[in-house]
Amino acid sequence: MDQSLTELSNTFSLSETKRLALHQELASILGNASNVYFMPPQEMLLSYPAIVYYVGGGSDSYADNVRFLPRTTFDVTLIEYDPMSAKVDAIRDLKHSSYMTSFKKDGLHQHKFKITR
């Protein structure tokens, strides 16, 4: 049975809830949740097209010496054979997404983004 995000927020930390919500959005864009990888080990064989993402840092806002707006930044990479994929625009359209760069490596096009939640 799938849990709603509300149920998940009662089970996981705020950061993990944000990550799981992002994972769902990325899986929806890719159309295949099994090819969305969070911090995969280097020796793992990936299936393409794929989205790989890592925690890239964060920032916090404070008022009266109390943290009230924690943010997590994710480094997201779309890896596929198509250099002009519509998936690039779909990821760019996500809330707080910034397109960083793209390059070709080993015959695969890699598009890098930063997404803050």
Task: Map each language-model feature to its residues.
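Signature of extracytoplasmic/envelope-associated structural regions
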Residues: 36-37, 85, 112
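Short cationic/low-complexity microdomains
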Residues: 73-97
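Acidic-leaning, charged glycine-interspersed low-complexity segments
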Residues: 89-117
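Small/polar-rich, solvent-exposed N-terminal microdomains that initiate assembly or binding
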Residues: 1-60, 66
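Oligomerization/assembly interface segments of phage tail-like spikes and tubes
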Residues: 70-81, 109-117
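Glycine-rich loops and low-complexity Gly/Arg-rich segments
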Residues: 61-64, 76-80, 99-103
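Short coil/turn motifs at beta-sheet boundaries
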Residues: 46, 67-71, 106-108
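Short, charged, solvent-exposed linker or helix-capping segments at domain edges/interfaces
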Residues: 62-65, 87-89
